Amino acid sequence: TAAMRDPNREGTPEHIKKAYTWLLSKQKDSGAIYGKGLATYNTSISVMALCASGEKAHHKNILAARTFLISMQQDHEGNKLMNKHHGGVGYGSSDPHSNLSVSYMAMEAIVTANIIARDSGEGKEDELDWESAMKFVSRCQNLEKTNDQPGIANDGSFNYDAASSKAGEKELPDGRKVKRGYGSMSYAGLLSMIYAELDQDDPRVVAVKKWLNENFTLEENPGVGQQGLYYYYNVMAKALTAANIDTLTTKDGKKIDWRKALAERILSKQREDGSWVNENSRWWENQPELVTPYAVITLEQIHASMPQPAKPTK
């Protein structure tokens, strides 16, 4: 995906063609695309890569993978309101429990592939149950008016899933212990709601935007420190672009041009060999093979979404 979104790319380099050949060799009869595990996660990022190719030859593979992702949505018949995993997506058979990270990536892949699905000419394609998906997403948000789960804060931020947060808990002034939301999942929550086409005035959207403005920082992934920092940068760029947000306003009223600030931050962290790496190893971010694509795709997202200067009037 990073290579294909290069704004200076001319054609498809031979080594990328080989990469696509390898990727397609990993597609299963179910439509899933993965090697040894994490079926839904790997299929989601594979769909994004295949869509980036622009090749009609990949459409059949994309549609099969899209159908697989839709089939992985948790559907707990007869217990939908009680089961906190209902409507979301998990890593796969080894870990079926829904989480917001995989759910948002699956939604992104499905939405990205929608135009191919609509133009396939093969009849009506399967669709995600968006109402159930938003029920799961709402249960990941710290917002009392729309979350029926216990132990949540009321600040609009998002947790990893409906039962827990990777940022742990915090104690409120009244002594209650609640889940602490954090940056990367809050941007993932915003993106999920945009993919579901929620209105910008929806209280869930308003609440998370407020939290993201007030907690903006590039020094850390707010709530979890240096953990998942480049994942945070990546989902930040995608969410703010999708939300048509050009500036953020911090608690002290400072206006932030997030594109400029984020690009400068990432470029300042590039190593001499051209790669990026996170000194914190959580979620494999000590591996340049993972973090460098995060950084490159983030920069490409910034470049592609930059507002065009107004044409001079005659």
Regions found by a protein language model. Give the residues of each.
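Surface-exposed loop and membrane-interface regions of Gram-negative outer-membrane beta-barrel proteins
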Residues: Y20-A32
